[in-house]
Each structure stands twice: as C-alpha cells, then as structure tokens.
C-alpha cells in the first residue's frame, strides 16, 4: 500500500467529517507508553481529541430491539479553548425510527485532573459541569445538561434526555470480558498520523430503561465500550475510514476497520479478534477481506453509504455478511468547526466460523467524505 504505514492495530473510532481545516491543537497530547487503570479512564487536560464511546443492542420484554449510541467527546482547539460534545442516538427497529441529538459546550481548561480540592468543590456546584473525581480512583464522572456518564473500567451508569425528541435512556453496564489493550500497551500508531491511546471493553452486560415518546421501557443486552485519546490528527479531510464491532452468538467478538487516504489507492485493513474467554488476536491487513456494496443515498445529506458488507478472515475460518437493521441511521451535527456527518447504526450479522453457523449483531460506523 503506497503512502500509508501498515496499521497492525485495532482501529475503532467515532467518525468525524470536518468541512474546514483541522482545528485541533496537538500541543498537549499525552506522551504515554502504557495504559494505566483506572487513571486512563479520566479526562486528559487539553487533549487534541478524545472520547468515551458506548454502542450496543438492547431488547425489551417483547423482544423488540433497540440500538443505542452514546459518545462524550473532549477536545482542545487552536483557539486555546477546551470543548465537550455529546452525541446520542437510539434506533427503534419495531417502528423504524432513528432518534439522535447532540450538544457542544465550551469547558474550562483544567478538565484533566486531579484538581485542587477548592477547584473541585466549586466546579461541581455549577449547573453545567464535567468533573473528575479526586482520590486514588479517577472514574469517569461527566455531566452536561441532560447527559451524564459515571463509573470506570466497564462499570458505567449513563443517562440521556434528548432535547429535540421525547427520547432518552438510563442504563448501567457490567464487564463480562477483560479490557482489550490495542497495540498491546494501549497505545497505537495510526499510520504515522498520531500515536493514540486506545482500549476497549467488549460485551458489557447492560440493563436499564429506554424512554420513547415519554414512555419508559425496561431493556437489557450488551454494549461495546471504546476509549481513545490523542486523535485530533485523524480527522483530516483526506483520511476516511469505516469501523465495526461485532458480537457473535458463540461469544466471540471482532473489531474491524478499513482506512483510506485520498492520496493513495485502495484500503488498509486491521482489527482484533476476541475469543469467548477474552483472549485477543491482532489482525493485520493481509488477514482481512472486506467488500462493501449496495449503496444507500441519504435523503437528507445526499451522501451514500454501502449497506451490504462481506467479511472474510481466512486464518480464523470466518465468513460473515453484515447489513443494517434499517438504512437511515445517519447523524448530521453542525458545529463551530464545520459539518459533522457520519452513519452509525445497528446491524445484523450471519455466516460461519470454523465450519459452524454463527450469527450476531454489530455496530457499524461509515464515513463518505
């Protein structure tokens, strides 16, 4: 592959399409060599771009299915301002409705702790706040208007209330597999673009309620958690990618990506396989075959996204097909730095592994810059 160093890591990110020059400052990116828990769960001060990400499939007592996406972004820009953005979405399969909302706010620059006790005490009394708790544990503890996320290391409580829809949720998660440190240490080199921190908790057991049209619905299922930082440089306009996290009914999980620079021909593939016990296998470019087709054109943005995906991993004897449960799961976010457009939604997966039939669910991210 010309012009891009091989990425022998798992690559999974929330997709940001920016219609202007890269606004992020990388001056304060973390110069780490290994992830340390629980500290790595907390905010990094003035980071170029970092996020905390949950997606998954939940069901109610009637087996109706719902997709949930929840992301907190924190970023520091070249105008020396730290900001926070939250993205939230719910896919209602039964009624074929996709709900989403977002919020962007300026934040104080001392987000990355630990804070002095006097700063901490005054800060948490604000009406709108993001906070980092003091002490030996630095759990996630964010609150931004009607959105909150608390906990650490797979034990999370998340709440959301959308402004423009009578929709939201109140969910708690519990880990069922060990943390996955991508790049072995939890730091990865994205093709020479940046060295980013990256780890995941796959298959989080999830329970709680979803609210649709002011009605609370008890649900349960599994979700996938991603944590990344130092990612400002990967939002450049000439870089595109697609990503998926797949959970199969044999209790194994896959994370796969394809990345492309507009300056180069073809795609670069990578990912991670996680077996039923939580053991991981790094998947390199030559290990993966991904073919996408049958484009769907958004009636809102006029962008096109492939709806049918064929996945092959010969070394694991895996052959899968993946398709969304409904076409329109696109988000369009208007921010101070331009238009943020991406497709992210719940998909069905079926195929075979080691000659045996498997099926499952996935979340898929797609860009089309």
Pin down the residues of each PLM region.
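Bacterial N-terminal signal peptides
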Residues: 8-17
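Targeting-peptide/extracellular-domain and disordered-appendage signature
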Residues: 3, 20-369
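Bacterial N-terminal signal peptides that target proteins for export
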Residues: 1-8
């Amino acid at each position: 592959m010309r012009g891009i160093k091989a990425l022998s890591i798992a690559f999974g990110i929330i997709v940001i399409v920016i219609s202007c020059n890269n606004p992020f400052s990388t001056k304060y990116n973390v110069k780490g060599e290994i992830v340390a828990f629980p500290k790595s769960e907390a905010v990094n001060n003035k980071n170029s771009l970092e996020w905390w990400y949950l997606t998954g499939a939940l069901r109610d007592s009637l087996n109706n299915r719902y997709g949930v996406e929840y992301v907190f972004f924190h970023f520091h820009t070249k105008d020396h301002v730290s900001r926070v953005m939250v993205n939230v979405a719910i896919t209602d399969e039964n009624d074929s409705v996709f709900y989403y909302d977002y919020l962007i706010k300026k934040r104080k620059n001392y987000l990355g702790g630990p804070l002095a006790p006097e700063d901490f005490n005054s800060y948490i009394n604000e009406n709108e706040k993001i906070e980092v708790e003091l002490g030996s544990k630095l759990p996630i503890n964010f609150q931004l208007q009607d959105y909150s996320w608390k906990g650490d290391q797979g034990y999370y409580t998340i709440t959301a209330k959308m402004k423009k829809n009578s929709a939201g949720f109140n969910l708690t998660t519990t880990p069922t597999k060990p943390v996955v440190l991508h790049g072995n240490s939890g730091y990865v080199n994205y093709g020479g673009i940046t060295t980013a921190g990256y780890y995941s908790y796959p298959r989080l057991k999830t329970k709680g309620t979803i609210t649709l049209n002011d009605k609370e619905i008890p649900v349960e299922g599994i979700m996938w958690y991603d944590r990344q930082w130092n990612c400002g440089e990967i939002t450049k306009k000439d870089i595109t990618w697609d990503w998926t996290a797949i959970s199969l009914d044999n209790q194994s999980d896959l994370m796969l990506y394809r990345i492309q620079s507009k300056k180069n021909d073809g795609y670069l593939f990578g990912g991670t396989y996680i077996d039923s016990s939580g053991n991981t296998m790094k998947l390199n470019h030559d290990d993966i075959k991904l073919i996408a087709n049958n484009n769907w054109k958004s009636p809102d943005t006029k962008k096109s996204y492939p709806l049918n995906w064929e996945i092959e991993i010969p070394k694991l004897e895996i052959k899968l097909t993946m398709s969304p449960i409904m076409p329109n799961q696109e988000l369009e976010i208007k921010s101070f730095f331009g238009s943020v457009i991406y497709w992210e939604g719940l998909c069905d997966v079926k195929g075979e592994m080691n000659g045996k039939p498997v099926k499952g669910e996935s979340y898929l991210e797609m860009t089309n810059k």
